[in-house]
Amino acid sequence: MREAVIAEVSTQLSEVVGVIERHLEPTLLAVHLYGSAVDGGLKPHSDIDLLVTVTVRLDETTRRALINDLLETSASPGESEILRAVEVTIVVHDDIIPWRYPAKRELQFGEWQRNDILAGIFEPATIDIDLAILLTKAREHSVALVGPAAEELFDPVPEQDLFEALNETLTLWNSPPDWAGDERNVVLTLSRIWYSAVTGKIAPKDVAADWAMERLPAQYQPVILEARQAYLGQEEDRLASRADQLEEFVHYVKGEITKVVGK
């Protein structure tokens, strides 16, 4: 199954890795494919997720050239018949090994940055609490396209740090403007955070949605069901029309997560 999914995007993957190697050799230590491609299967709007590890920081010329070239290998979900959205996260080895929280991210590229990139705006290196979650994902499920396996290269992220990152993420969503236009992703991400808070593991979005469905009061189940079906391409996404129900869902699930990870 995993090999078939990777084969489905092999041409695009080769192009992306080629761009990374061209700009980052000889400082390149590893490239890991993680996310839906290797855990649960690519869905209609799934990204291709790559974690790249290098030995030194990027100079500004390299950063800009790499990002501009990555832009040519990626497309926003639904905009291309042959290209998927690509998300590339780059870390410097000594910033994350040995592990400490919060860790520093050297670079991140994704379709949400496209307009900024085209306008000449490039995100600098920054502290990123999400690296605790990302590295946990990579250690649990990934394929090394370059370099050693993730579980050999990276230290385990302590559960306390994972919980802290999950808890920090919850602060992003407090009122409807915080999820406007991104309703499906927020519903599914909250389900994954809830799953991770309870189990200490990370699951694909649809698996976490099924898990959450079994634990939700009946009045919130239509929200997660619609998000799941839209994610799988089985139903149109109409979550924006469920404004009151959606807000109640968000606050309920945040409350359940907080019971587990604390405040």
UniProtKB/Swiss-Prot annotation:
<dbReference type="GO" id="GO:0009012">
    <property type="term" value="F:aminoglycoside 3''-adenylyltransferase activity"/>
</dbReference>
<protein>
    <recommendedName>
        <fullName>Aminoglycoside (3'') (9) adenylyltransferase</fullName>
        <ecNumber>2.7.7.47</ecNumber>
    </recommendedName>
</protein>
<dbReference type="InterPro" id="IPR002934">
    <property type="entry name" value="Polymerase_NTP_transf_dom"/>
</dbReference>
<dbReference type="GO" id="GO:0046677">
    <property type="term" value="P:response to antibiotic"/>
</dbReference>
<dbReference type="Pfam" id="PF13427">
    <property type="entry name" value="AadA_C"/>
</dbReference>
<keyword id="KW-0046">Antibiotic resistance</keyword>
<keyword id="KW-0808">Transferase</keyword>
<dbReference type="GO" id="GO:0070566">
    <property type="term" value="F:adenylyltransferase activity"/>
</dbReference>
<keyword id="KW-0814">Transposable element</keyword>
<comment type="function">
    <text>Mediates bacterial resistance to the antibiotics streptomycin and spectinomycin.</text>
</comment>
<dbReference type="InterPro" id="IPR024172">
    <property type="entry name" value="AadA/Aad9"/>
</dbReference>
<dbReference type="InterPro" id="IPR025184">
    <property type="entry name" value="AadA_C"/>
</dbReference>
<dbReference type="GO" id="GO:0005524">
    <property type="term" value="F:ATP binding"/>
</dbReference>
<dbReference type="InterPro" id="IPR043519">
    <property type="entry name" value="NT_sf"/>
</dbReference>
<keyword id="KW-0067">ATP-binding</keyword>
<keyword id="KW-0548">Nucleotidyltransferase</keyword>
<dbReference type="Pfam" id="PF01909">
    <property type="entry name" value="NTP_transf_2"/>
</dbReference>
<keyword id="KW-0547">Nucleotide-binding</keyword>
<keyword id="KW-0614">Plasmid</keyword>
